[in-house]
Amino acid sequence: MPRAKTGPGGLRGIRSVIYPVLDLDRAKDFYATAVDRNPYFDQPFYVGFDIDGQELGLDPDTSERKPGPGGAVAYWRVDDVAETCRRLSEIGGRVVSAPKEVGGGLTMAI
């Protein structure tokens, strides 16, 4: 897959959108039907669907975000998380959570 052009802030496009859900099994069944595929990751703490290179995630932890689309969180795809955080901070962005490894070779920051 060709790499997308990186913008001046290091952002390449949305990588993931994660919805907090109250009923993980019901949401999993709904989205499996809606996107016509099974999740690639299916655990009690998270369900993930790969939809042509973008992730739809379902998170049963609603302690910090309200369930449904209003509580959804989008994550950007970048080449270098630490460098992108630095560059976005320089132009007025705020890093809420420093870059950290979250498993599977993935690093994230908020």
Language-model features, listed with the residues they occupy:
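Acetyl-CoA-dependent GNAT
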Residues: 41-42, 59-63, 101
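Core segments of cupin and vicinal oxygen chelate
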Residues: 12, 18-56
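Vicinal oxygen chelate
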Residues: 1-10, 14-22, 47-50, 65-110
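Conserved beta-strand in the GNAT
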Residues: 56-59, 110
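Short linear motifs in intrinsically disordered
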Residues: 35-40, 75, 98-100
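Short, surface-exposed beta-strand-loop junctions and turns on beta-sheet-rich folds
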Residues: 55, 64-65
